[in-house]
């Protein structure tokens, strides 16, 4: 058989250099590469670096690199993130708005109790779409007309609720979960103690994809 490529994946490519773990892995990869160059009649392509590796080990690009999250504008380090531009935007629209009296409950398991008379909007995204339950109970928030609205109560399978008491809005108004210029996917994911990889790769198939070239 003809060997086309040999690759590895650094386990801690974003760790500050020098990294003993990465250095050991790189040394082993170099030894394998050298053995192939001596013993093989056809030299396969070698690649080692993911997005973080491209920035942290630019001298090890070999024949190709595997940029994944960097294509979305993230690189796991503030210094590297500053060199990239986030491109992913997740928006939805308000489906319903309800007035909720003080002391009333919202969501499964009475997840949120209105401390005052409130206005609650419903959005048609839930954990089946990749917005996990860990964003509920005021941990996550969205933006309407540039104003921040917290997610209240439990995130449901197909919907979630936000507090818009102090925001002028109506059904069908656009809601931004994360954008390219503010509250990026990295920022939004941190609200739920997650990472941009998880939120971007976990968006469900019901969410319409629009690609702008």
Give a label for each model feature.
Residues 8-13, 49-53, 88, 92-95, ...:
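Small-side-chain structural scaffolding
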Residues 99-213:
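C-terminal accessory subdomain/extension
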């Amino acid at each position: 058989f003809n060997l086309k490529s040999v690759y590895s994946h650094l386990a801690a490519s974003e760790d500050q250099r020098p990294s003993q773990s990465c250095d050991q892995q790189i040394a082993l990869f170099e030894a394998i590469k050298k053995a192939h160059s001596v013993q093989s009649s056809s030299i396969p392509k070698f690649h080692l670096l993911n997005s973080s590796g491209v920035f942290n080990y630019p001298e090890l690009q070999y024949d190709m690199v595997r940029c994944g999250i960097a294509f979305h504008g993230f690189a796991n380090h503030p210094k590297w993130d500053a060199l990239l531009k986030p491109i992913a935007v997740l928006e939805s629209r308000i489906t319903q708005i309800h007035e909720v009296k003080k002391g009333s409950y919202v969501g499964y398991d009475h997840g949120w109790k209105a401390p005052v008379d409130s206005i609650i909007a419903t959005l048609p995204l839930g954990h089946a779409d990749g917005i996990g339950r860990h964003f509920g109970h005021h941990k996550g928030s969205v933006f309407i007309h540039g104003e921040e609205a917290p997610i209240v109560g439990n995130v449901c399978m197909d919907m979630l609720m936000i507090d818009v008491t102090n925001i002028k809005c109506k059904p069908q108004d656009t809601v931004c979960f994360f954008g390219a210029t503010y509250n990026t996917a990295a920022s939004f994911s941190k609200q739920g103690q997650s990472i941009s990889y998880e939120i971007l790769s976990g968006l469900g198939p019901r969410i319409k994809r629009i690609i702008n070239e």
